[in-house]
Amino acid sequence: MNLDTTTIDSIVAQAEVAIAQASDPTALDQVRVNFLGKKGLFTEQMKGLGKLPKEEKPKMGQVINIAKQAVQKLLTERGELLRAQEIKEKLAAESIDVTLPGRGTQIGGLHPVTRTIARIESFFGDLGFEVKDGPEVEDDYHNFDALNIPEHHPARQDHDTFYFNPKLVLRTQTSGVQIRTMEVEQPPLRIISPGKVYRNDYDQTHTPMFHQVEGLMVDKDVSFTHLKGILHDFLHHFFEEEVEIRFRPSYFPFTEPSAEVDIMGKNGKWLEVLGCGMVHPNVLRSVGIDPEVYTGFAFGMGVERLTMLRYGVNDLRAFFENDLRFLKQFK
């Protein structure tokens, strides 16, 4: 093939036809290789420049470069067109009917027990009570002895308590957290200790594992009046209504005097909701606090019990059966 402008024009014309006939990006790329590649037609023409007279080389080289640029422009334009067509076809194949109804999203919710604990923490947090935590596997000193529960007390018997060995138990209340706090912190103290506790019992109103929140306040001149006022406000806040409340004398080894708190149910009967009392002097002495200087009150409530009363649940075991039909009611 002679190297002249006619030849170059012919190659450009061939390229135009080949580019126009390329139906997809792969075919177009093959056209590029055939004309502009290392072994393409334009490369062969460039090699022929060496055979031309010296004065003709620059002019012919310029002609070839202009032709190559023209072909490259055609390739680029055709490539953009093919890619646009490809995208259009893909969108048409994967089109979305915006008139179809949307798919609902499954939204989770907090477990009712978790909701109750959060509600309790929020109320007492506003009163300056700190949330404290402690071990669920507890030694007998912090679970019993320091709480004025002697070795012969019924609460320490095997049928009520889960023992690992004679000195190690699954805690039966979160009161051990109060002892551990008073061992390392000095009054004034305001704490609550929510957490899991364990007792060997299982029926409609009891499970071997349940949740408890215990509270403690120790300071100078703390009285039973303070305790009654705080618990009275808490119960009205928790149930979001004016509930009738009574304090009934009771006995707990770690408080003196002690009381149980009842509320009037919708059926006209009193329902026990928590226990409380003034911290026993022996408990204060066990942690190095002088009961002649400081006094305090303590209270404890079963979270599941309060949750049952708030939401009208009859069987405590429903909280632990993972039945979504039940749990979805509390979103």
Swiss-Prot record:
Instruction: Name it.
Output: Phenylalanine--tRNA ligase alpha subunit
Q: Which domain of life is it from?
A: Bacteria
Q: Do the record's keywords include Metal-binding?
A: yes
Instruction: Provide the GO MF annotations for this entry.
Output: ATP binding; magnesium ion binding; phenylalanine-tRNA ligase activity; tRNA binding
Q: How cofactor binds (record note)?
A: Binds 2 magnesium ions per tetramer.
Q: Which family does it belong to?
A: Belongs to the class-II aminoacyl-tRNA synthetase family. Phe-tRNA synthetase alpha subunit type 1 subfamily.
Catalyzed reactions per annotation: tRNA(Phe) + L-phenylalanine + ATP = L-phenylalanyl-tRNA(Phe) + AMP + diphosphate + H(+)
InterPro entries (UniProt xref): aa-tRNA-synth_II (IPR006195), aa-tRNA-synth_II/BPL/LPL (IPR045864), Phe-tRNA-synth_IIc_asu (IPR004529), Phe-tRNA_ligase_II_N (IPR004188), Phe_tRNA_ligase_alpha1_bac (IPR022911), Phenylalanyl-tRNA_Synthase (IPR002319), tRNA-bd_arm (IPR010978)
GO CC, one annotated term: cytoplasm
By its UniProt entry, which NCBIfam families does this protein fall under? pheS
Which CDD domains is this protein grouped with?
PheRS_alpha_core (cd00496)
Provide the alphabetized UniProt keywords: Aminoacyl-tRNA synthetase, ATP-binding, Cytoplasm, Ligase, Magnesium, Metal-binding, Nucleotide-binding, Protein biosynthesis
Name the Gene3D superfamilies on file: Bira Bifunctional Protein, Domain 2
Q: Where in the cell is it found?
A: Cytoplasm
Which EC number(s) does UniProt give? 6.1.1.20
Matching Pfam families: Phe_tRNA-synt_N (PF02912), tRNA-synt_2d (PF01409)
Q: Name one GO biological process term.
A: phenylalanyl-tRNA aminoacylation
Cofactor dependency: Mg(2+)
Q: Where does Mg(2+) bind?
A: 256
| Quaternary assembly | Tetramer of two alpha and two beta subunits.
